[in-house]
Amino acid sequence: AYAAKPATPEEVAQLLKAASENGVPVTARGSGCGLSGAARPVEGGLLISFDRMNKVLEVDTANQVAVVQPGVALTDLDAATADTGLRYTVYPGELSSSVGGNVGTNAGGMRAVKYGVARHNVLGLQAVLPTGEIIRTGGRMAKVSTGYDLTQLIIGSEGTLALVTEVIVKLHPRLDHNASVLAPFADFDQVMAAVPKILASGLAPDILEYIDNTSMAALISTQNLELGIPDQIRDSCEAYLLVALENRIADRLFEDIQTVGEMLMELGAVDAYVLEGGSARKLIEAREKAFWAAKALGADDIIDTVVPRASMPKFLSTARGLAAAADGAAVGCGHAGDGNVHMAIACKDPEKKKKLMTDIFALAMELGGAISGEHGVGRAKTGYFLELEDPVKISLMRRIKQSFDPAGILNPGVVFGDT
């Protein structure tokens, strides 16, 4: 593939217009952190890298938005807003990821339980169509009810409809005080039964994660975590619930943390450990690296299915049973607050693994869920998507793709598997 690094929207427009006229496939690339292969270029095609379009153009505190280019890394956006008392709250597992990549996959992360995913935090876009036309969608306003919402249509489209060249993101107040509670449970069903109680309590956790015992052991061993949990408790528990809270007032945070700890004990936790400062940060950072910890211990693949929260116990127990029947294993952690399961799959037989993955994805959909909650379909999941998704919906998506990209140059092979 050939590569281009445009510096302006106009240069992107020139590249796309020429590519359309000559039938050259185009793949956009941000920081390359995606887990579904959507940024992998087509042989003989053009890779458009947004490395040079990496500026925070404006931080507008009056409207609580930032205007950024797609190549801006989340760490750089956070630094640019640090002195304003505001922040962008979409925090996927890799903070070096770009805002453009977040938009492309509708990224989420651990804080989605409180702040939502990318589509809840992106108010407007500038995008270039495959014809070379430049459009603006949305804006700095909090709401709009004028025609179709093109901003939301482009978010999550994985570079198949248009290339984003500017993003208006919503900013939220920074809350200076935070702490976490880690609670081991002897039974996984108790973990999931605690989740709706915490969400209904009014405490508004910004992180609400489950971690199964196998994954916690992997995190502790690979990330050198010292959590102060006795071996006897670690050996006897099936899963953990991590609850993080934030507040602008330290005393209120202390009261809320006490309340959470008491609730967890009443809901069946073996114990509740308050993690402050460095310990909490280390565990959260380790949780963000859970995929790599699983890979280091032999996992062959990872899935990020999403199901209704109430269906998580059935999904996880059934998935583990399917894996065992295939002479494999399915372990993991995930966003308990929004039903997003991050499961590492270990299965050495390629045919068995493919069937296992299909069965697990089918299970998620039978329970009212979806194949991917935040990683996207990309190239890696196209076969499963086309096999399991409603064909009427797929047909409609193809027609939308055709309307935006009649020449079919944008990211062929992604979502639909066409090359």
Locate each region found by the language model.
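Activity-critical C-terminal alpha-helical subdomain
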Residues: 133, 382-419
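C-terminal substrate-recognition/cap domain of FAD-linked oxidoreductases
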Residues: 173, 184, 192-359, 363, ...
